[in-house]
């Protein structure tokens, strides 16, 4: 591609409303242009990258035996009412009416549509298993779209749905899709982790997320430094400490603590080690009352784990100060297990503490030197806290590391969440109607592009992994309009590289070398060749990889072999 014929539009300025690196660089490189909040036009440059990601996804899905189809983006309300999601989904669902006042929505997902398709088309168990996918535009009406295409309202997604006669068959296909996703993200050249995850609004039981690791990631993932264990921090098990609580060394005493409302206040004002403190958090109970959850002072309550407790209401709701005072007679900063008139659950780490400090259930007072059994009965024990770096890995191999991740893929074993409600059945071998079981597998195709930039950039711009770069090689002639030798060699090389199938961006613009170099670094082309009079006199061209700190002179006679090695 000749730059003189390509609509390249770069900028030195960072847009004021672009908060994260990928948004900034995609705008500066001219990959996207904002139309409205959360809506973007993909320019020819950006679309080349998007199509590369899409092609990798399509090739691997086809290789896995899935079949591509295309469903309507606009969906009738009746299907969503069948699944009961019409009223549950919330304002993110863009609802609209046609000229006949019939209700529709712009699909954020397609579980209902695909289930309707299968219940109409698939009649016999002999037609199963069946795995169907599409790559299509989705819309979610985010309350605050931000971060460019990372959290846009309109986005490109690959969504796949598998149908099975039984759970064993679903589990086999799920494993195939897990391996397929692993190949997809390996092929994009990104560093990622597959983690056990919560199913969220989609529903179902078994679930894994695929995260591209990047400091700007919204999610925290935990993974072992010695094994393949990885999980979303929300689901990662905090292993119970070994052994029992040490024997008491102190006598419990009540201490006036005026103004001490937080753990930090206690640690600062009374010289307590934070790991010797306990905080008491009060939440709404499933029976309409309140429940106290106790975690160590330096630990954080894990909301997902708390919600799984049968005595805790779902969704998790923290009790307000008035509710707490009405039940206990003290404010939330003065609560503890001794004579607490609420049902309690304590974290595993709290259960093995001795001589610890907690609120006295009176304002401005705490108990120091509390011990289980002697001063208060040990209540129910559960895994309540979020894991931290250095915790033992739950699989017994190594310790946990915590990293930020950007979710780019999610796979679910849905089970019969949708098929039962929508009566999707087939005739089994005995001739009886049997409800099918389902799997669901999504990849945010446009989000992968942004995540790749978050993971691969420097101060000068994007550093594309080679498999998804818009072009493989930038050919940059210097003084082309003034030197016949440069023009002749550049044109010759351009023709040869094209003939070999190399995706070349030939910067034949009448621009200063500095402008050309800055643009090529900004848009992130992995390889660059510079042709100039000085080099040609010595029979060489200058090569530089996008990640290289120095350039290399390559003899023209060796260039073909050199590039074959570099370009793979």
Curated annotation (Swiss-Prot):
Query: EC number(s) on record?
Result: 6.1.1.15
- Which reaction(s) does the protein catalyse, per the Swiss-Prot or TrEMBL entry? tRNA(Pro) + L-proline + ATP = L-prolyl-tRNA(Pro) + AMP + diphosphate
For whether the record's keyword set contains ATP-binding, the answer is yes
Concerning InterPro entries, the annotation shows: aa-tRNA-synt_IIb, aa-tRNA-synth_II, aa-tRNA-synth_II/BPL/LPL, Anticodon-bd, Anticodon-bd_dom_sf, Pro-tRNA-ligase_IIa, Pro-tRNA-synth_IIa_bac-type, Pro-tRNA-Synthase_IIa_type1
The subunit structure is: Homodimer.
Comment field on protein domains: Consists of three domains: the N-terminal catalytic domain, the editing domain and the C-terminal anticodon-binding domain.
User: Which gene holds the coding sequence for this protein?
Assistant: proS
Q: Which family does it belong to?
A: Belongs to the class-II aminoacyl-tRNA synthetase family. ProS type 1 subfamily.
Q: Which UniProt keywords apply?
A: Aminoacyl-tRNA synthetase, ATP-binding, Cytoplasm, Ligase, Nucleotide-binding, Protein biosynthesis
What GO MF terms are annotated?
Answer: aminoacyl-tRNA deacylase activity; ATP binding; proline-tRNA ligase activity
Instruction: Kindly report the protein's main subcellular placement as a broad class.
Output: cytoplasm
- What stretch or stretches form a coiled coil here? none
Cite a GO CC annotation: cytosol
Q: What is this protein called?
A: Proline--tRNA ligase
Q: Which PANTHER family does UniProt cross-reference here? A: MITOCHONDRIAL RIBOSOME PROTEIN L39/PROLYL-TRNA LIGASE FAMILY MEMBER, PROLINE--TRNA LIGASE
HAMAP family assigned to the protein according to its UniProt record, in alphabetical order: Pro_tRNA_synth_type1
Instruction: List the subcellular locations.
Output: Cytoplasm
- SUPFAM superfamilies, sorted: Class II aaRS ABD-related, Class II aaRS and biotin synthetases, YbaK/ProRS associated domain
